[in-house]
């Protein structure tokens, strides 16, 4: 699986993901709008990881084939837990995880 990290996704996460990972910066796609970025990413990647929680409201994702994973935070210690799920994404997935509620001890 080939995965693209959006701007804002901590690059150290790539070492924990069992997939080939590139970043928007490395691809020289930093200036693309969300719609252009998703179209370009879909032509070359299987998955897209972002921190943009508004993406699903800003873009029509219904026809997208690329898997999209929205991270709930950029805090590195919390992100390691998401590496397995990112590597296991399937075509067309849209996964948006929330952080666990720290007040809920159950």
Q: Language-model features: where?
A:
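Short secondary-structure boundary segments
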Residues: 7, 51-53, 72
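Glycine-rich loop at the start of a catalytic domain that most often binds anionic cofactors/ligands
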Residues: 61-65
């Amino acid at each position: 699986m080939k995965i693209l990290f959006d701007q804002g996704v901590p690059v150290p996460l790539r070492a924990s993901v069992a997939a080939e990972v590139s970043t928007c910066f490395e691809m020289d796609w930093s200036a693309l709008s969300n719609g252009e970025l998703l179209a370009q990413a879909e032509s070359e990647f299987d998955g897209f990881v972002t921190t943009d929680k508004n993406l699903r409201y800003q873009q029509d994702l219904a026809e997208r084939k690329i898997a999209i994973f929205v991270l709930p935070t950029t805090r590195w210690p919390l992100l390691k837990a998401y590496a397995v799920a990112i590597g296991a994404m399937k075509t067309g997935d849209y996964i948006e995880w929330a952080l666990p509620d720290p007040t809920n001890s159950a």
